[in-house]
Regions:
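Solvent-exposed soluble domains appended to multi-pass membrane proteins
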Residues: 1-200
């Protein structure tokens, strides 16, 4: 585990090639992962293990392009096993998708209540997430944000890879409805059914 939160702590035995602390922690993370996998390969359990690497959140890269910068929520997910054929997927997903994706790789049947999908078997038409006071819904071309404090809706066209503010119209309604229905469902599970009961 490593953090991109200051203060940046690099072990004294590690000698980075770069001078910027933010780059040094990336160098150290890369080195530490290499060391970890070199040692793991020597273990008898290596070929029977699925390794999952992911970030919990991103970091502001460049200028904030909107009220909730996408770089805060754009995180990597890497799944590795010596028994899995390498491939790269560039479709988006969420942290809720990790569990069903791993269970799918293991061919394990499961009862699932966390709104995730198996990213290797289906593509998400859209995704929602929350951060601070914002609710966000997005797909490949549109970004919908709702600020709870100001009760303001913010809408962007992201189809060309850049965020362009556009007026709210009917094309954003599926994102809005999906995002709020997911939040309401989660709240219902927590308050009414109680998530502890789902574990039984």
């Amino acid at each position: 585990s490593i953090s991109n939160h200051p203060p940046y702590v690099i072990p004294p035995f590690f000698h980075p090639k770069t001078s910027e602390p933010e780059m040094q922690i990336v160098e150290y993370a890369d080195w530490a992962l290499r060391q970890f996998f070199e040692e793991a390969r020597k273990q008898p359990w290596f070929d029977n293990t699925i390794f999952v690497l992911e970030g919990d959140h991103g970091k502001l890269v460049g200028d904030a392009e909107c009220e909730l910068p996408e770089s805060y929520n754009h995180i990597p997910l890497m799944i590795y096993s010596s028994r899995i054929q390498p491939e790269e997927k560039t479709t988006f997903g969420g942290q809720v998708d990790i569990q069903p994706t791993i269970l799918g790789l293991l061919n394990i049947d499961y009862l699932q209540n966390n709104f995730g999908v198996d990213l290797l078997k289906e593509e998400r038409p859209c995704m929602f997430y929350t951060a601070d006071n914002m609710v966000v819904g997005r797909n490949d071309t549109l970004l919908y944000l709702y600020n709870y404090e100001t009760q303001q809706e913010l809408t962007y066209d992201i189809g060309n890879g850049k965020l362009n503010a556009v007026p709210m119209d009917d094309s954003f309604l599926p994102l809005k409805e999906y995002s709020f229905s997911m939040l309401q469902s989660a709240e219902f599970l927590v308050k009414q059914i109680k998530t502890d009961d789902l574990k039984k």
